[in-house]
Amino acid sequence: MTKAYNIIHHKFDVVVVGAGGAGLRSAFGMAKEGLNTACITKLFPTRSHTVAAQGGISAALGNMGEDDWRWHMYDTVKGSDWLGDQDAIEYMCKNAPDAILELEHYGVPFSRTEEGKIYQRPFGGMTTEYGKGKAAQRTCAAADRTGHAILHTLYQQSLKHKVQFFVEYFAIDLLMEDGECRGVVVWNLDDGTLHCFRAHNVVLATGGYGRAYFSATSAHTCTGDGGGMAIRAGLPLQDMEFVQFHPTGIYSAGCLITEGARGEGGYLVNANGERFMERYAPAAKDLASRDVVSRAMTIEIREGRGVGEHKDHVFLHLNHLSPEILHSRLPGISETAKIFAGVDVTKEPIPVLPTVHYNMGGIPTNYHGQVIIKDGTNHNSVVKGLMAIGEAACVSVHGANRLGSNSLLDLVVFGRSSALKAAELISPASPHKPIKEASLEKIINRFDKVRHANGNILVADLRLKMQRTMQSHASVFRTQEVLDEGAGMISEIRNGYKDIKINDKSLIWNSDLVEALELDNLLDQALVTVYSAAARKESRGAHAREDYPDRNDGDWMKHTLSSIDEAGKIVIDYKPVTLTTLTDEISAIPPAKRVY
C-alpha cells in the first residue's frame, strides 16, 4: 500500500506535533538548545486553541499582596482533590514566577498596575496562608486575552530560533518499534502527500478532546489527536474520567466567559435574584473551585431556581462594575456577550451554564514531559522517544480538578522542561534507529481504509450521536446506571465507525477525511472516559457520583490507567498518586476535606 502513495521522508532531532502554547514553548526551547526541530500543526500556529484562553496565568509574584509559591502549591493540591502528583505540582508552582518573567522578557504585553508591575487578579481556589488567609491575587493577566498575547509571543520566539514549521499537516500515527517511538506519519493537506518524519523524540502537544461533547468551550479542532495516536500505539491514558465543566459558558452558544469576570467582582444569581454561591461556598463564594461552582449551578437549575423560559440556566452579573473596569480588564467578554448572547454587560446579566472546558486526563508523563507506563512493580518506566505536554498530557498537576489559570502555566513550564530534557538526552544530528517497512505499511493501510470507506453512516451524523451521548451520560453529575448505559452506547457508536461513508476520496484539502480521522481519535477517548468514570465508585473533583457522594481515599486515591487492547476491549488499571514532594522546601500536603 505504501507504493500507492507519494511518501516523503524527513529526519529531525525532534518533532513537535501541535503549535499551541505547550508545543511552541517546547519547539523553540529545543531549537534554542541546538536541536534540529520540526513543528507539525494541522492549523496555522496562532489559530491554536491557546489563543482562546482568557483570564490569565498563575504565579506567586506577590505584585498585588503577599504571596508564596508554597501557598500556590497547597491550593493546587487541594484543587486537585488530592489526585495531583505533589512532586510535579511543586515543580510547576516553584518555577511559575520565573516562567512569567521569561514570558515578560519575550514580550508578552501583560496588563500593569499603576506602579508598572504585572497586574494580577483573584481566581477560583487561589488563597493565601495555606487556605487560611484571604483570596490571593495570583493570576497574571493581559486584559481578558492572555492566551492570545502568550501564543503570538511564543510563535515569534519560534521563528526567531528557526523552528521548521509544517503548517496544515495532519498527524496520522506514531511510528513505534520495540516499545520506542521513532517518528510520526503525517498528511499534507495542501498537496496530498504523506510524510514520514523520523526523530529521536516526538512531542505530542495536541491539546484536549473537548469536542467529544456536544457543548464545549473548545474550538472544533480540539479532537485529542495525540491521545488517539497514543491509544492506537497501545499506550494507556490516565484519569480520563475527570472532565472539567467551566461554570460560565454562554447559554446555548457554549462560548467561554472567563473566571476573571468573577475575579473582577462578577457574581452568579438564580431566578430569585439570590447570590446562591454563598450557600455552597461561604468563604470563597463565586470564586470557589470550578467543579464546586458547576455543581452548585446544576443543583439550582434542577431544583427549579433556574432563569429563562425553560428555567435551565443562571445569570452572571457584571452590570454593577464600572464601564471603565469592563473596558480595560474585560474588553473581550463585553464583545463576546454582545455577539453570542445579545447582552450589553453594562446593563444586563449574561445567561450562563456549565460547559465542557478542559480534560484533566491525558497521556501519562513525568515532570520532564516524558511519557511513562507502569511496569510490573507499580513503578513508572519511560517510553523512549516520546513526550507529551499541555492538555494532551497528564503530569498530573491538575488531578481531579484544574484550578483556573493553572493551564497556561502548565503549558509554559512543562513545554520548557521537555526542551531541557530533550537537550540532555539527544546529541544533535546523531543517526536515527531503523524502522521496519511493516510499521509504516500498517499506518498507511489504516489511512487508506478510512479514505475509501464506503459504508452507510455519515461522519457528521456519527459524531453528533457521540457528542449527545457524552453530554447526557458523562456530565456534571453521574450514576452507575447512567454511566453503564453511556458506556454501552459509546461502544455501539464506536462500532458504527466501521460503517462510515467518505464521499470525497481526494487527498487535497479533503475535510471529510480529516473529520473522519478526528472522529476516530475522539471516539477512542470518549470510550475510555465513560468506562473509567463507571469504574470509579467515589466522588472526587470533577467526577461527581450521586450514588457515591463522598471521596474515598482508602480505595480510590489512585490514578486510573485506561487503554484499548487489539481486540477492542477496554483495559482498566491503576497506579498510586505521588504524595511526596520533590524537595524538602515544602512538606507533603496530607489529604483533608475539601471546603471552600
From Swiss-Prot:
<keyword id="KW-0274">FAD</keyword>
<dbReference type="GO" id="GO:0050660">
    <property type="term" value="F:flavin adenine dinucleotide binding"/>
</dbReference>
<dbReference type="InterPro" id="IPR003953">
    <property type="entry name" value="FAD-dep_OxRdtase_2_FAD-bd"/>
</dbReference>
<feature type="modified residue" description="Tele-8alpha-FAD histidine">
    <location>
        <position position="49"/>
    </location>
</feature>
<feature type="binding site">
    <location>
        <begin position="41"/>
        <end position="56"/>
    </location>
    <ligand>
        <name>FAD</name>
    </ligand>
</feature>
<dbReference type="Pfam" id="PF02910">
    <property type="entry name" value="Succ_DH_flav_C"/>
</dbReference>
<feature type="binding site">
    <location>
        <position position="357"/>
    </location>
    <ligand>
        <name>substrate</name>
    </ligand>
</feature>
<feature type="binding site">
    <location>
        <position position="246"/>
    </location>
    <ligand>
        <name>substrate</name>
    </ligand>
</feature>
<dbReference type="InterPro" id="IPR011281">
    <property type="entry name" value="Succ_DH_flav_su_fwd"/>
</dbReference>
<dbReference type="Pfam" id="PF00890">
    <property type="entry name" value="FAD_binding_2"/>
</dbReference>
<feature type="active site" description="Proton acceptor">
    <location>
        <position position="290"/>
    </location>
</feature>
<dbReference type="InterPro" id="IPR027477">
    <property type="entry name" value="Succ_DH/fumarate_Rdtase_cat_sf"/>
</dbReference>
<keyword id="KW-0813">Transport</keyword>
<keyword id="KW-0816">Tricarboxylic acid cycle</keyword>
<feature type="binding site">
    <location>
        <position position="225"/>
    </location>
    <ligand>
        <name>FAD</name>
    </ligand>
</feature>
<dbReference type="GO" id="GO:0009055">
    <property type="term" value="F:electron transfer activity"/>
</dbReference>
<keyword id="KW-0285">Flavoprotein</keyword>
<dbReference type="InterPro" id="IPR003952">
    <property type="entry name" value="FRD_SDH_FAD_BS"/>
</dbReference>
<dbReference type="InterPro" id="IPR015939">
    <property type="entry name" value="Fum_Rdtase/Succ_DH_flav-like_C"/>
</dbReference>
<keyword id="KW-0997">Cell inner membrane</keyword>
<dbReference type="InterPro" id="IPR030664">
    <property type="entry name" value="SdhA/FrdA/AprA"/>
</dbReference>
<feature type="binding site">
    <location>
        <begin position="407"/>
        <end position="408"/>
    </location>
    <ligand>
        <name>FAD</name>
    </ligand>
</feature>
<dbReference type="GO" id="GO:0006099">
    <property type="term" value="P:tricarboxylic acid cycle"/>
</dbReference>
<comment type="similarity">
    <text>Belongs to the FAD-dependent oxidoreductase 2 family. FRD/SDH subfamily.</text>
</comment>
<dbReference type="InterPro" id="IPR014006">
    <property type="entry name" value="Succ_Dhase_FrdA_Gneg"/>
</dbReference>
<feature type="binding site">
    <location>
        <position position="391"/>
    </location>
    <ligand>
        <name>FAD</name>
    </ligand>
</feature>
<protein>
    <recommendedName>
        <fullName>Succinate dehydrogenase flavoprotein subunit</fullName>
        <ecNumber>1.3.5.1</ecNumber>
    </recommendedName>
</protein>
<keyword id="KW-0472">Membrane</keyword>
<keyword id="KW-0249">Electron transport</keyword>
<feature type="binding site">
    <location>
        <position position="258"/>
    </location>
    <ligand>
        <name>substrate</name>
    </ligand>
</feature>
<dbReference type="InterPro" id="IPR036188">
    <property type="entry name" value="FAD/NAD-bd_sf"/>
</dbReference>
<comment type="pathway">
    <text>Carbohydrate metabolism; tricarboxylic acid cycle; fumarate from succinate (bacterial route): step 1/1.</text>
</comment>
<comment type="subunit">
    <text>Part of an enzyme complex containing four subunits: a flavoprotein, an iron-sulfur, cytochrome b-556, and a hydrophobic anchor protein.</text>
</comment>
<dbReference type="GO" id="GO:0022900">
    <property type="term" value="P:electron transport chain"/>
</dbReference>
<keyword id="KW-0560">Oxidoreductase</keyword>
<dbReference type="InterPro" id="IPR037099">
    <property type="entry name" value="Fum_R/Succ_DH_flav-like_C_sf"/>
</dbReference>
<keyword id="KW-1003">Cell membrane</keyword>
<feature type="binding site">
    <location>
        <position position="402"/>
    </location>
    <ligand>
        <name>substrate</name>
    </ligand>
</feature>
<dbReference type="GO" id="GO:0005886">
    <property type="term" value="C:plasma membrane"/>
</dbReference>
<feature type="binding site">
    <location>
        <begin position="18"/>
        <end position="23"/>
    </location>
    <ligand>
        <name>FAD</name>
    </ligand>
</feature>
<dbReference type="GO" id="GO:0008177">
    <property type="term" value="F:succinate dehydrogenase (quinone) activity"/>
</dbReference>
